Amino acid sequence: MLEGAKLMGAGAATIALAGAAIGIGNVFSSLIHSVARNPSLAKQLFGYAILGFALTEAIALFALMMAFLISFVF
């Protein structure tokens, strides 16, 4: 019973990974649209896109860490 609850909790924690993937796609989609509209700002916009990617990926890594903690520690 407890093992099943752990697996369900870990599975629920990994749902955030799908949200992070969608967020990263939105970041780079917005980058492509912005550079297409104003190519002279490409370098500055790329820096902002990398920052957005890093923050979104950090959330995904925290969710993955929680899933591993639920699976293997508790």
UniProtKB/Swiss-Prot annotation:
It is found in: Mitochondrion membrane. GO terms for molecular function: ATP binding; lipid binding; proton transmembrane transporter activity. The record marks E57 as: Reversibly protonated during proton transport. The chain crosses the membrane at residues 8-28, 50-70. Keywords: ATP-binding, CF(0), Hydrogen ion transport, Ion transport, Lipid-binding, Membrane, Mitochondrion, Nucleotide-binding, Transmembrane, Transmembrane helix, Transport. The keyword Ion transport applies. Pfam families: ATP-synt_C. One of its GO terms (cellular component) is proton-transporting ATP synthase complex. It is a multi-pass membrane protein. One of its GO terms (biological process) is proton motive force-driven ATP synthesis. Belongs to the ATPase C chain family. F-type ATPases have 2 components, CF(1) - the catalytic core - and CF(0) - the membrane proton channel. CF(1) has five subunits: alpha(3), beta(3), gamma(1), delta(1), epsilon(1). CF(0) has three main subunits: a, b and c. This protein is one of the chains of the nonenzymatic membrane component (F0) of mitochondrial ATPase. HAMAP family: ATP_synth_c_bact. This is ATP synthase subunit 9, mitochondrial. It comes from Nicotiana tabacum (Common tobacco). The gene is ATP9.
